[in-house]
């Protein structure tokens, strides 16, 4: 019952803040709970959801390359402007940090920070116009911060 109330609260915050992706995800989980199929489907989502979500996200990002709307010439021009070069460098950094964050949460087993990451992502998506992909980057920054402080 408590978990249903928490997901319902997330749904309300998401709807109020117009965070459609969070609202849709919370709605899906609520429907699965109400249909009492959560014990069968939640383990699959929990185990493979991140992987399949990333596959779909990356596929969506790669569609312009697959369609041919982004050419080799376009890719070459990326390195000719400071904005393109900055985007490339920042992409390297944030992708690396996301990987560190995923490892921090899963391999290293620091799941105790997950509630704070979820709450921050939901609030940022609902009220700051953010997109809730931040928990991996956030946990990556956290992993680097923890490593840095451990060396002091």
Curated annotation (Swiss-Prot):
The chain crosses the membrane at residues 5-25, 41-61, 75-95, 117-137. InterPro entries: UPF0756_TM. It is found in: Cell membrane. Coiled coil: none annotated. GO terms for cellular component: plasma membrane. Pfam families: DUF441. The keyword Transmembrane helix applies. It is a multi-pass membrane protein. It comes from the Bacteria. The keyword Transmembrane applies. Keywords: Cell membrane, Membrane, Transmembrane, Transmembrane helix. Belongs to the UPF0756 family. HAMAP family: UPF0756 (MF_01874). This is UPF0756 membrane protein Moth_1009.
